[in-house]
Amino acid sequence: MIQISDKAQTYFRKLIEREGVPGMGVRLSAVDAGTPRADARLEFAEPADLSGDEWAIDCDGFTLYVVAASVPWMDGAEIDYVTQSTGNQQLTIKAPKIKGEAPAESASMVERVRWVVENEINPQLASHGGRVAVQEVSADGVVLLRFGGGCHGCGMADVTLKQGIEKTLMGRVPGVIAVRDATDHATGDAPYIPRDSAA
């Protein structure tokens, strides 16, 4: 079920009235659903733009069309038009399922480690142009990672590994006892912090 607040409905209705196109509504879709890059997209939709398989939600003065393939990802979504502490108003969309759900505790350790790496660790490393890939997860809970991008050859990779990645994985995935680096950092060609300049 998707909730759209009265304020958001009023906001959309005014925008649609300004466009002056008969039958215009708003289409909601999930982009890159089930991934860390997932996002919700809202756009005007004229009747000719619709494919016919959208879910239609009647709102005050317009229809919200949800792209059929996006419906499972938008379950529980909330659309609101809020006033921020600065006084500015902003449309917000909260879609708790859009990035997928963490694997259940019954899932393999490999699945749980990969999910945390892709959904929690890599988005943080991306701010430095870096990433890590899970190379192996041993039966006794040792995770072997390979750094890439700005982390490949970075002088702070050891700190990132021990204080960031290992701490996160050990805290989020029961059974992980250590995290090790399998990267040949000497071959990194664009490190965020060159190894010879790291403190």
From Swiss-Prot:
Cofactor binding note: Binds 1 [4Fe-4S] cluster per subunit. The cluster is presumably bound at the interface of two monomers.
One protein family per Pfam: NifU
GO-annotated molecular function: 4 iron, 4 sulfur cluster binding; iron ion binding
One GO BP: protein maturation
Cofactor(s) it depends on: [4Fe-4S] cluster
Cleavable signal peptide: none
List of residues binding [4Fe-4S] cluster: C151, C154
Superkingdom of source: Bacteria
InterPro entries linked: Fe/S_biogenesis_protein_NfuA, FSCA_dom_sf, HesB-like_dom_sf, NIF_FeS_clus_asmbl_NifU_C
Gene3D superfamilies recorded: Fe-S cluster assembly (FSCA), HesB-like domain
Sorted UniProt keywords: 4Fe-4S, Iron, Iron-sulfur, Metal-binding
Keyword Disulfide bond among record annotations: no
Keyword Iron carried by entry: yes
Residues passing through the membrane, by range: none
Similarity comment text for this entry: Belongs to the NfuA family.
Function of the protein: Involved in iron-sulfur cluster biogenesis. Binds a 4Fe-4S cluster, can transfer this cluster to apoproteins, and thereby intervenes in the maturation of Fe/S proteins. Could also act as a scaffold/chaperone for damaged Fe/S proteins.
Assembly and binders: Homodimer.
UniProt-recorded name of the protein: Fe/S biogenesis protein NfuA
Gene: nfuA
